[in-house]
């Protein structure tokens, strides 16, 4: 397969952030071929101030044991305190004894490997379309022309809604054929488990913020979420590129399961720290939408993924999102005469469209979106 390279004019590279533009001649991301070259294409090389630091210190994140948690008042109080401290500082914590079977997690990783092992032509049958958040993406080569991530992804929607009870299974069968029903069955079950887990976590977040225990659980009960399979191939020049660039998740809550390979890094106190893979734990982090719901009390923290020259890395990311027409506004308990509103009301559909059509997610996405909402017409 031939590899075509993108050339961008200085004018195109200087385009403002809120105009992503369309790339006419996208680069084909084929890592096995790119790794045969002496260097990686310029589109994958990040600026010096954003290049990765591979050997970084480990981040101390609290480990929350969910076993019998919500039925034990003392344990619940301790957990909510630890979560509050972490979410005010960097927004990351781990959960164990979460009730998700090891077999299901293993199957989800296995089918991730099977999908990304398929020929490119097969994966492109579900190619992500411009302006959409679902489908297969090959390093976002058709969306951006610079600072490309060294990864492939497959994203699909999960609707925790009785009227669309098999949305994931239907996606795989409709998009790829009935031969992919086993894929759909595994990821349908996995997403249902993630949705259930996220609602438990929402109870703890509510308690930690001093609002009614069921407030956030009820807010997200009929969620319209996103599941993403991430594949980071080995790279001959891992010191020049990133698997995922620095960003804050625009969604509400991310539940991540890593394989055994290091790669996740979080920016805390002006330095990058790593979160070591733990096969028995899920990494949980606050996203921009929940930061708005908490009226800025909890932080959506900058994070990224690095790659290496020896091992491929895979991860499973479930992004909890509210129903698309649900108005995101803080509960009254988080507002008073002293604490003013930090962000205007919005719906998830508005924010999602902003990130897909107008803005490349980074550490300022929520503020840029707020400015965009309130700018004079």
Swiss-Prot record:
Q: Which residues form the Fe2OG dioxygenase domain?
A: 222-322
Catalytic reactions of this protein: gibberellin A12 + 2 2-oxoglutarate + 3 O2 + H(+) = gibberellin A9 + 2 succinate + 3 CO2 + 2 H2O; gibberellin A12 + 2-oxoglutarate + O2 = gibberellin A15 + succinate + CO2; gibberellin A15 + 2-oxoglutarate + O2 = gibberellin A24 + succinate + CO2 + H2O; gibberellin A53 + 2-oxoglutarate + O2 = gibberellin A44 + succinate + CO2
Keyword Lipid biosynthesis among UniProt keywords = no
Q: Which GO terms describe its cellular component?
A: cytoplasm
Question: Pathway, per Swiss-Prot/TrEMBL?
Answer: Plant hormone biosynthesis; gibberellin biosynthesis
Record-annotated membrane-spanning stretches: none
Q: How is expression of this protein distributed across tissues?
A: Highly expressed in stems and inflorescence tissues. Detected in seeds, roots, leaves and siliques.
Q: Phenotype on deletion?
A: Semi-dwarf.
Induction comment from the UniProt entry of this chain: Circadian-regulation. Up-regulated by auxin, paclobutrazol and cold treatment. Negatively controlled by the level of physiologically active gibberellin.
Q: What class of enzyme is it?
A: oxidoreductase
Binding of Fe cation: at which residues?
247, 249, 303
A molecular-function term among this protein's GO annotations: metal ion binding
Q: Which UniProt keywords are present, listed alphabetically? A: Iron, Metal-binding, Oxidoreductase
The entry's active site is 313
* InterPro entries in the cross-refs: DIOX_N (IPR026992), IPNS-like_FE2OG_OXY (IPR044861), IPNS-like_sf (IPR027443), Iron_ascorbate_oxido_reductase (IPR050231), Oxoglu/Fe-dep_dioxygenase_dom (IPR005123)
Free-text remark on how the cofactor is bound: Binds 1 Fe(2+) ion per subunit.
Identify the domain of life: Eukaryota
Q: Which coenzyme or cofactor does it need? A: Fe(2+); L-ascorbate
Provide the function of this protein.
GA53 is less effectively oxidized than GA12 and is only oxidized one step to GA44. Involved in the promotion of the floral transition, fertility and silique elongation, but plays only a minor role in elongation of seedling organs. Acts redundantly with GA20OX2.
The record's similarity note reads:
Belongs to the iron/ascorbate-dependent oxidoreductase family. GA20OX subfamily.
This protein's name: Gibberellin 20 oxidase 1
């Amino acid at each position: 397969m031939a590899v075509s390279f993108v050339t961008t004019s200085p004018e195109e590279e200087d385009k403002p952030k809120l105009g992503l533009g369309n790339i006419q001649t996208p680069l084909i991301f084929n890592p096995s071929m790119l790794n045969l070259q002496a260097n990686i294409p310029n589109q994958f090389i990040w600026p010096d101030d954003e290049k990765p630091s591979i050997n970084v210190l480990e981040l101390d994140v609290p480990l929350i044991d969910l076993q019998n948690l919500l039925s034990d008042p003392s344990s619940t109080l301790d957990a909510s305190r630890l979560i509050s401290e972490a979410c005010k500082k960097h927004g990351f914590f781990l959960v164990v004894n979460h009730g998700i079977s090891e077999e299901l997690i293993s199957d989800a990783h296995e089918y991730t490997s099977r999908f990304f092992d398929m020929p490119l032509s097969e994966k492109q049958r579900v190619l992500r379309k411009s302006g959409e958040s679902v489908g297969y993406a090959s390093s976002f080569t058709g969306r951006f022309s610079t600072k490309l991530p060294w990864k492939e992804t497959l994203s699909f929607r999960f609707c925790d809604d009785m009227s669309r009870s098999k949305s994931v299974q239907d996606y795989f069968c409709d998009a790829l054929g009935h031969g992919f029903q086993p894929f759909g069955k595994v990821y349908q079950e996995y997403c249902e488990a993630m949705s259930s887990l996220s609602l438990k976590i929402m109870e703890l977040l509510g308690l930690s913020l001093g609002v009614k225990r069921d407030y956030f659980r009820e807010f997200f009960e009929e969620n319209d979420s996103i599941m993403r399979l991430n594949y980071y191939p080995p790279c001959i020049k891992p010191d020049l590129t990133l698997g995922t660039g620095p960003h804050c998740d625009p969604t509400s809550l991310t539940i991540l399961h890593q394989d055994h390979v290091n790669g996740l890094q979080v920016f805390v106190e002006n330095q990058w720290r790593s979160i070591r893979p733990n096969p028995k734990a899920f990494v949980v982090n606050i996203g921009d939408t929940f930061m708005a719901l908490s009226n800025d009390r909890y932080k959506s923290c900058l994070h990224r993924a690095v790659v290496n020259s020896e091992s491929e890395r895979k991860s499973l990311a479930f992004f909890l999102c509210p129903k698309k027409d649900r108005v995101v506004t803080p509960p009254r308990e988080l507002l008073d005469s002293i604490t003013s509103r930090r962000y205007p009301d919005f719906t998830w559909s508005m924010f999602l469209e902003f990130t897909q059509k107008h803005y490349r997610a980074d550490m300022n996405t929520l503020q840029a979106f707020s400015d965009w909402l309130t700018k004079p017409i």
